[in-house]
Amino acid sequence: GSMRKADKERLAIEAAKLFVDMEKTSNASIALVEFSNKVVSSGLLDTSQQENKNQLKEVLDGVRYSAPAHTDTGAGLLEAVSVLDGSDVRNEKVIILFTDGKTDIDAGTPNRTIEDSLNDVNTAIQEAAQKGYKIYCIGLNADGKVDEEMLRNIAASTDGQYKIATDVNDLPDFFNSIFAQIDKSEKQNIDEFDADGNYHEMHFTIDNSSVMEANIVILSSMQIEDICLTDPSGTEVDIQENARVEFNNSAKYSLLKLFTPDVGEWSIKVKGVTGDHIKVNLIYNYDIDLIVEVENTVVVKGKKINLQVYLYSRGEKITDKAIYQNMSGYLTIQNKNSQEQ
């Protein structure tokens, strides 16, 4: 309920939809938990299926900020923890909280008080921390009244992060910091410009063959329809029909997801509404695993050991030297009995 004032432009909805579209298309699931005077969960949906992503975004579009002011943060966080408890134990698990940071319980709500909700916030934080679930908080501050201290505490207690945002442009960097921890992603700023009604051409480079997905994120205050993409061979890509491209757009953003993009220089042309400020980012993730081969089965302190370390992608050893440039690493050996390192 309090989001009616803090998020008049429905930034939370646009940001959550952008996150859904940016999420990788393999080995990932997303659940939506909506909380007001009651909690509604979509359950975990596999993001490898486009229809599931569309379903999640339809649910988000249907969210209404209605009076009276109900924001039961504690109940929402407890439900989010419960949803993650039932997910695949092998995957990294995170909670992303979109909120104005205010917990509001209407005075007429039976058997529920603000104190109850705040106690549940603390319980959820403790459970998340114990289970290794990081909580990332996005504080929506359109009315300047965000409870930053609450968000800082939630994030710090679970080894997460928080971000205060007034515009969707504030969020791709923050999203990338999340993806960097769970999806091995990197971000590049391609360009930003004020639209003049003509096409604005930009270039970006895919510099190695192990990029699994590349997300071109176009942020604007008005919806963009005219986008042209050209691959390194100079061929224009049909962004609506090409099987290696997924195109999504909404009120505040457009997103092109390129699957296993070709190495080389790409170009993109964007035509926006005159006067609109447009920002274009590239966020990409790798399909890479680290393989360590050790000759010795017994390690003796003070004795030399031989080991080989490789990067693998799609089951094959990576030989692309560009990926190995500027890499460094360290090895820790620990005695299982004494715990000495």
Question: Model segments located where?
Answer:
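VWA/integrin I-like adhesion module and closely mimicked acidic/polar interface patches used
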Residues: 7, 11, 62-70, 75, ...
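Von Willebrand factor
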Residues: 1-47, 77-80, 94-99, 137-139
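Short, solvent-exposed loop/linker segments at the N-terminal edge
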Residues: 206-208, 297-303
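C-terminal "exit" segments of structured domains
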Residues: 162-259, 265-271, 276-286
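A short beta-turn/strand-edge loop motif at beta-sheet boundaries
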Residues: 89, 210, 222-223, 313-326
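Beta-strand-rich structural segments
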Residues: 302-317, 327-329
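Short, compositionally biased P/S/T/A/G/V-rich stretches that sit at domain boundaries
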Residues: 282-300, 310
